């Protein structure tokens, strides 16, 4: 922490990635938007007392059971993801049902990415997100993640 002499505001210095805490969040039965906003808060560091908007001080998040996330209302049948191939007439639309079957991690990553800053800082924070299909996160046991009931 650094205290400036001309103001009462205390600013945090850039934190070291080695001291980053990791959290495990189970997406099973959770609503996509509510889950994504909680994950985005942790990635930004807003859960910390020393939160500073321009500093990458967030923690890492591992989301498991990505394929079991749910949507409310008729969105499961109506939600569509758009992407452009780069060719003429290359606009593609993929319904949520197909996307969750083919790439369940993309659904959560896309939602969280929309809730982070659209800057270098947001891209850096996205690197601390891991989304896994299934309930096993054995490859991340070495970092001793904390299981959240968020």
Curated annotation (Swiss-Prot):
GO terms (BP aspect): negative regulation of translation; translation
Cellular component terms (Gene Ontology): cytosolic large ribosomal subunit; ribosome
Record keywords, A-Z: Ribonucleoprotein, Ribosomal protein
Xref: InterPro entries: Ribosomal_uL13 (IPR005822), Ribosomal_uL13_bac-type (IPR005823), Ribosomal_uL13_CS (IPR023563), Ribosomal_uL13_sf (IPR036899)
Domain of life according to the entry: Bacteria
SUPFAM superfamilies: Ribosomal protein L13
Pfam families per record: Ribosomal_L13
GO MF, one example: mRNA binding
Subunit structure and binding partners: Part of the 50S ribosomal subunit.
Family: Belongs to the universal ribosomal protein uL13 family.
Stated role: This protein is one of the early assembly proteins of the 50S ribosomal subunit, although it is not seen to bind rRNA by itself. It is important during the early stages of 50S assembly.
PANTHER family per the UniProt record, alphabetical: LARGE RIBOSOMAL SUBUNIT PROTEIN UL13M, RIBOSOMAL PROTEIN L13
Annotated protein name in UniProt: Large ribosomal subunit protein uL13
Organism: Chlamydia trachomatis serovar D (strain ATCC VR-885 / DSM 19411 / UW-3/Cx)
Gene transcribed to yield this protein: rplM
């Amino acid at each position: 922490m650094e205290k400036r002499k001309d103001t009462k505001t205390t600013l945090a210095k850039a934190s070291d990635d080695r001291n980053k805490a990791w959290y495990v969040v189970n997406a099973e039965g959770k609503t996509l938007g509510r889950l994504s906003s909680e994950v985005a808060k942790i990635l930004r560091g807003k859960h910390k007392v020393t939160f500073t908007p321009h500093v990458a001080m967030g923690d890492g998040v591992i989301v498991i059971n990505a394929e079991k996330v749910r949507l409310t209302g008729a969105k499961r049948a109506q939600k569509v993801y758009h992407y452009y191939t780069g060719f003429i007439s290359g606009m593609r639309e993929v319904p949520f049902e197909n996307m969750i079957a083919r790439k369940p991690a993309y659904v959560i990553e896309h939602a969280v990415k929309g809730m982070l800053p659209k800057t270098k800082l947001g891209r850096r924070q996205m690197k601390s997100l891991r989304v896994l299909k299934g309930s096993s996160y054995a490859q991340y046991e070495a970092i001793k993640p904390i299981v959240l009931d968020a």
